[in-house]
From Swiss-Prot:
Species: Streptococcus pneumoniae phage HB-3
InterPro entries assigned to the protein according to its UniProt record, in alphabetical order: Amidase/PGRP_sf, Amidase_domain, Cell_wall/Cho-bd_repeat
EC number per UniProt: 3.5.1.28
GO CC terms: extracellular region
Catalysed reaction equations from the record: Hydrolyzes the link between N-acetylmuramoyl residues and L-amino acid residues in certain cell-wall glycopeptides
UniProt xrefs under PROSITE patterns: CW (PS51170)
Residue intervals of the N-acetylmuramoyl-L-alanine amidase domain: 19-151
Protein name in UniProt: Lytic amidase
GO biological process assignments: cell wall organization; defense response to bacterium; peptidoglycan catabolic process; symbiont-mediated cytolysis of host cell
First-tier enzyme category under EC: hydrolase
Amino acid sequence: MDIDRNRLRTGLPQVGVQPYRQVHAHSTGNRNSTVQNEADYHWRKDPELGFFSHVVGNFRIMQVGPVNNGSWDVGGGWNAETYAAVELIESHSTKEEFMADYRLYIELLRNLADEAGLPKTLDTDDLAGIKTHEYCTNNQPNNHSDHVDPYPYLASWGISREQFKQDIENGLSAATGWQKNGTGYWYVHSDGSYSKDKFEKINGTWYYFDGSGYMLSDRWKKHTDGNWYYFDQSGEMATGWKKIADKWYYFDVEGAMKTGWVKYKDTWYYLDAKEGAMVSNAFIQSADGTGWYYLKPDGTLADKPEFTVEPDGLITVK
């Protein structure tokens, strides 16, 4: 899984000694925070006020502290058992956003338990395993904490204690196909991967996914091949004629925008050499500069246009 380590803080004090036997599950308690400002604050805060190893939110995982080092994260004796401590932001505005981050949260907690050689169990009587902050508050020696996270926040999005336990122990089934959140759509393959910064043909239709994996829609894209492509509101790549912002464009079967002369169904059209828009009701000079072509109001080439030269030299078309 992708983990951003741009705010990984080194030099934090070691708490306890190895082996560390717990992974701790937290939520931030801040309804306005983002994953980035949580990471930024952790970067500069006094570690004696507490520190943790990871924060999940806004479809990202950021590692902000070391693992296998202990941590001041649960306010008691089990600080010295912390292999990793994971915070989940509490500022989600839609269920789709929450579920995307919840999936990352579960996957990360399980992966960290595997990494530490710990059982993927939640809040059991055994010392080793994944423990919520609430469980630590109620069961650790020398407790000085009153925190009950992450249960209240999970419950606010419909995740019960039983569901959380099941998801920790069994994992979440991989979501496949089209997925949506507040930013846009992406497509998940059967192996859990998704396309980034590339074209992909899905069910016979071509789409383009940006560097973050989101589908382009209602947008132009200049590709590395030098060609321009257009993706409509549904994300489908344009081919053939397409009216965009009241201008007509033509795209070949590969989706590339055409310029210059184009023959379509035995009729010639001219597409602006720079912008690609169809030219209409206008004269276009021949390539050798010896003459002019006339394009009718519908954009088709007039094979035998009739002109009138007005007294002031203005040329009009009959």
